[in-house]
Amino acid sequence: DKNLDMISGSIAHLVAATAKPVFYDAEHFFDGFRSDPGYALATLQCAVDAGASRVILCDTNGGVMPHELGHAIREVRKEIPGIKLGIHVHNDGGLGVANTLRAIEEGVVQIHGTINGIGERCGNVDLTSIIPNLELKLGYECVPEGRLKGLTNLSRIVWEYLNIQGPTGQPYVGPSAFAHKGGVHVSA
């Protein structure tokens, strides 16, 4: 198969040309897994056999549901034991954070994301949401102690640099995050 040969040749060339680890980004992996799981897994095995030290599973269209993502990752880990996985999700379905957290629960060791979720179409997973969830709710250490509060300022700097008003309701870092005002919610 030409595609498998191209994957193998590209990875082998990069491994031979550099002393650095080679990561394989499996673009459209979850779409491919949905339509042909065997072939999707074969592409990953091919990359690993050629020397890729890590495989990044990509939800390129941002359309996978968390339960589908979890199932696919479990199948990958079952079929290719010992594989080191990363995750790269888009937020087209509003599930970027949920899918990334699910991937971590399934053993993924690397996250691709951006500050404020900035990216093509509906964006990538927002690291200003992922990092606090990992630190505060799941017990991971992502940033040096005492630096978590700096995410709010970082978020604002990025929005300012882009000349965009950030959403007031942005989780963890938006001005309305954790603010309670009068009304039905407070009186309930």
What do the predicted segments below correspond to?
Residues D1-L85, L101-V108:
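Alpha/beta enzyme core
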